[in-house]
């Protein structure tokens, strides 16, 4: 069973992070971009595939992805949509 919203909020809080929840519909996409901060992201429901210059990473419920500052990435939401929680570090 995937972690609940409360469990994921607690994980972020323990790391000193401020969680922000978001979701997208099936097939939604994010174009190539980067951030000036370290992004910490958990998938809570559905799936999303992050595309990087090093290859693709698919996240499913309970999976975590850390994206270092300056890393170029794009994303495609899976067939069931997605709900994620993320925060920035630094």
For each of these PLM feature ranges, what is it?
Residues 26, 36-37, 55, 71-72, ...:
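A generic "binding-loop/recognition-motif" signal
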Residues 26-27, 45-48, 90:
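Short, charged/polar surface micro-motifs in flexible loops or helix N-caps
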Residues 34-49:
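Short, conserved beta-strand element in jelly-roll/cupin
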Residues 53-69:
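Short acidic-glycine-tyrosine-enriched beta hairpin
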Residues 9-11, 29-35, 51, 76-77:
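Short histidine-centered beta-strand/loop micro-motifs
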Residues 70-90:
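Ligand-binding loop in jelly-roll beta-barrel domains
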Residues 18-35, 69:
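Conserved short histidine dyad/triad with adjacent acidic residue
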């Amino acid at each position: 069973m995937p972690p609940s919203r409360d469990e994921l909020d607690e994980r972020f809080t323990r790391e000193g992070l401020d969680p922000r929840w978001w979701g997208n519909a099936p097939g939604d996409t994010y174009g190539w971009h980067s951030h000036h901060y370290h992004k910490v992201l958990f998938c809570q429901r559905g799936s999303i595939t992050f595309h990087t210059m090093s290859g693709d990473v698919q996240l499913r419920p309970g999976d975590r992805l850390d994206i270092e500052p300056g890393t170029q990435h794009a994303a495609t939401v899976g067939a069931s949509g997605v709900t994620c929680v993320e925060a920035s570090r630094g």
